[in-house]
């Protein structure tokens, strides 16, 4: 009944599909890329990058969406769409570089970009839901997100790695599999563009509906 809500939900689910797959196979890929790299040092670097870049992207995305959204509500769809558009080449490129250092640099940018859609998406989830159903809205949001992204992302990437391994070595099979997995960003981008198109109408309707509910 709320097109922007469902489009947002699919947008973040497809976007997280790729990022969850990366989180599962990234370390395995880096070890295959350079087996001589100090593993303990690598794990520390990955921890710092994941903890700072992703959080930074979430904060930056929320601030940017609120700033632009105060002038045009469609920014809550545009900001995630732009960020995920940047994730696509950055993610694929990170798997085709020849050194761990360059991969970590691109991965930092990737995590920064992929964190940007969180703030706008949660804003949409809470704003568009009736005030007497916001807890259920969040629960349904996470159900769809985890069914598609957490359940599908790592599974799909793992299957593709096994498929490509029939003709390629471990390193290249992960490169081809993850490049294919990152293509799921395309429907995510489309979903957020749909959000931008239908959000003004749904946002106005939600504000009116919630005002009526609040007034009793």
Regions found by a protein language model. Give the residues of each.
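Extracytoplasmic gate region of multi-pass secondary transporters
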Residues: 2-62, 91, 114-122, 149-161
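Residue-level signature of the transmembrane alpha-helical core
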Residues: 9, 13, 47-51, 81, ...
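A membrane-interface helix-boundary motif in multi-pass transporters
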Residues: 38-39, 75-78, 161-185
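Loop-to-transmembrane helix entry/capping segments in MFS-fold secondary transporters
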Residues: 39-43, 131-141, 174
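Hydrophobic/aromatic positions within or immediately flanking transmembrane alpha-helices
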Residues: 43-47, 74-80, 104, 135, ...
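Paired intracellular helix-loop junctions of major facilitator superfamily
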Residues: 69-71, 125-134
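C-terminal transmembrane helical hairpin of 12-TM major facilitator-type secondary transporters
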Residues: 71-121
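Multi-pass alpha-helical transporter architecture, strongest
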Residues: 88-97, 179-215
């Amino acid at each position: 009944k709320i097109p922007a809500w469902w489009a947002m939900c699919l947008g973040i689910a497809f976007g997280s599909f790729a990022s969850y797959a990366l989180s599962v196979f990234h370390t395995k890929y880096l070890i295959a890329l350079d087996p001589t790299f100090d593993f303990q040092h690598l794990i520390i670097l990955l921890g710092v990058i994941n903890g700072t870049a992703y959080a930074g992207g979430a904060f930056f995305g929320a601030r940017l969406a609120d700033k632009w959204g105060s002038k045009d509500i469609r920014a809550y769809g545009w900001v995630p769409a732009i960020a995920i558009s940047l994730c696509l080449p950055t993610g694929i490129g990170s798997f085709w570089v020849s050194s761990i250092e360059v991969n970590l640099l691109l991965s930092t940018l990737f995590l920064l970009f992929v964190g940007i859609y969180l703030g706008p998406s949660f804003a949409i989830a809470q704003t568009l839901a009736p005030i007497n159903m916001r807890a259920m809205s969040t629960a349904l949001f996470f159900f769809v997100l985890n069914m598609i992204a957490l359940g599908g992302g790592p599974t799909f990437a793992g299957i593709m790695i096994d498929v490509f391994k029939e003709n390629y070595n471990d390193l290249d099979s992960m490169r081809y599999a993850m490049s294919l997995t990152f293509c799921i960003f395309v429907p995510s981008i489309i979903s957020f563009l749909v959000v931008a198109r239908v959000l003004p109408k749904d946002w106005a309707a939600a504000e009116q509906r919630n005002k009526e509910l609040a007034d009793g």
